[in-house]
């Protein structure tokens, strides 16, 4: 039996919004330690890894490990029926072919009960190696989303150049080019408004903006985002989910563009 109750149900709604445009179906791994998901996107270019720890839920019970195949569009549609203030409970029997979703208003006066059909999915687990990164940039998540959105009007790829004093985002396209430079902030009252850079060596890498714009759908999950980069390994875009876990997106750099000198 699996049952998880989340008083702040809007977190779960935001998690689905962050996933559903990138991956259509995925296997949710339910265990005593929490819920996790790992999936390549449908074009096998990027990877998503999500962790929601059991202690982040208000009550959590999972008697045995369950792999639950879920159509994320279907789950998102059902979660849209929950109000932002609703308490959400997820429930499944051990060998169930459905997941129950229960939404309660805070005053308990309205209870909505949905059942979603589960899928049989063959999922290969990819090992994600632990990695030391040359540059780690932490910045406001809304700022990163804005940069990706703005530069996607200029070109379809962004060059991210990271140095000790700042990080630069550049794009080239038919209409010209655009460059946005963020300097490391020296003193900020609110930590979530800071730009901090930890650099072992400078990095300049090119990434497809189409995927970064998918990743930034996770912006409502966290006020900050962390970008971890090294030459020849995938970029990691990480959003911390307060007290619960994280969503990490991995995207390999574009190589052919760099050889053409762009």
From Swiss-Prot:
Belongs to the PCNA family. The keyword Nucleus applies. There is a cross-link at residue 164 (Glycyl lysine isopeptide (Lys-Gly) (interchain with G-Cter in ubiquitin)). GO terms for biological process: leading strand elongation; mismatch repair; regulation of DNA replication; translesion synthesis. The lineage of its organism: Eukaryota, Metazoa, Chordata, Craniata, Vertebrata. One of its GO terms (cellular component) is PCNA complex. It is found in: Nucleus. Signal peptide: none annotated. Homotrimer. Forms a complex with activator 1 heteropentamer in the presence of ATP. Component of the replisome complex. Residues 61-80 bind DNA. It comes from Coturnix japonica. HAMAP family: DNApol_clamp_arch. Keywords: DNA replication, DNA-binding, Isopeptide bond, Nucleus, Ubl conjugation. The gene is PCNA. NCBIfam families: pcna. This is Proliferating cell nuclear antigen. GO terms for molecular function: DNA binding; DNA polymerase processivity factor activity. Its main location: nucleus. Monoubiquitinated by the UBE2B-RAD18 complex on Lys-164. Monoubiquitination at Lys-164 also takes place in undamaged proliferating cells, and is mediated by the DCX(DTL) complex, leading to enhance PCNA-dependent translesion DNA synthesis. This protein is an auxiliary protein of DNA polymerase delta and is involved in the control of eukaryotic DNA replication by increasing the polymerase's processibility during elongation of the leading strand.
